[in-house]
UniProtKB/Swiss-Prot annotation:
It catalyses: tRNA(Gly) + glycine + ATP = glycyl-tRNA(Gly) + AMP + diphosphate. One of its GO terms (biological process) is glycyl-tRNA aminoacylation. Belongs to the class-II aminoacyl-tRNA synthetase family. Its EC number is 6.1.1.14. Tetramer of two alpha and two beta subunits. SUPFAM superfamilies: Class II aaRS and biotin synthetases. This is Glycine--tRNA ligase alpha subunit. It is an enzyme of class 6 (ligase). The keyword Cytoplasm applies.
Amino acid sequence: MNLQTMIRTLQDYWSEQGCIMLQSYDVEKGAGTMSPYTFLKAIGPEPWKAGYVEPSRRPADGRYGENPNRLFQHHQFQVVMKPSPDNIQELYLGSLEKLGINPLEHDIRFVEDNWENPSLGCAGLGWEVWLDGMEITQFTYFQQVGGLECFPVTSEITYGVERLASYIQDKENVFDLEWTEGISYRDIFFQAEFENSTYAFETSNTDMLLTLFDTYEREATRQMQDGLVFPAYDYVLKCSHTFNLLDARGVVSVTERAQYIGRIRNLARRIAKTFYESREKLGFPLLKEEGGKRHE
C-alpha cells in the first residue's frame, strides 16, 4: 500500500466514524495538536469530530536528508473526537485493520506516555502505540488546553504518517517510501529537506528572527484586544515556529528558552480564555441539545 492510498484509507475510515475531513492548516506548526482544528476545538462543551493530515515542522530535527528517520518536516494524520467515544481504542484498532494490520497477528502495545505541551499550556493522559516494536501513534485524552480544564474530554489520535508507511511498506529509509505509483518520498521532499535543514542550522538571519518574534507577539496581543481569536492564534503559531528556528540555531540560552516558552504560553492561555468566552456568548452553537453540559 503506497502512502497516498494509506492516507485515503484513514480518511475514509474516520469519515465513516462521523469525522469531518479537513485540509491542513496553512500556518507553520510543530505538531497537528497546534492546529486550531484541535487546540481551539478542544475548548468548551461543543462536540467536534475531525481528521486531517498536518505537515509538522521541527527545525531542530532536520538532518539534511541524511538520516533515514529524522526530518525537518514530517506529516501527522490527526483525529480528534469530543466527547471521546467509550470505544475509541477499538475504533483505532479498527483503523489498523483497514490498513491490513490485524491486531491479533501483531504485537500492539499501548505504552503509557502522558503528554504535555508547555508552550500551549496543554496536558493529558497519553499512550504511545507500538506496533511490533515501532512507535506509530500517540494516543491522548486531553485534560487541559490553554490552561483550561477540558470538559468533556477530547481524545486525540496522532498517526506518524512516515513511520506507519515505513512499517506497511517495509522500508528502512523514509526517502524510499512510495508516495504513489512511480513517485517516491525522495522525489517530492528530499530537496526541501536538505535546503530547510541548511536554512535552520546555517543561513537563517537570527537578528531578523528575534525581531519577528517580538513583532508577532505584539500583533497577537493587539488582535486579542479586539477579540479576534483566529488572527491572534495565527501569530501565536508564528511565534512558536520562530522560536523553534532560533532554538535550532543555538542562539537561545537555557534561561531564555524558558522565558520564550512562557511568553508563548501566556498568549495561548489568553486566546483559549477569549475563545471560550466568545463561544459562550454565542450560546455554544454546536451544542444540539439544551441538556448539553457546560464547561465550568
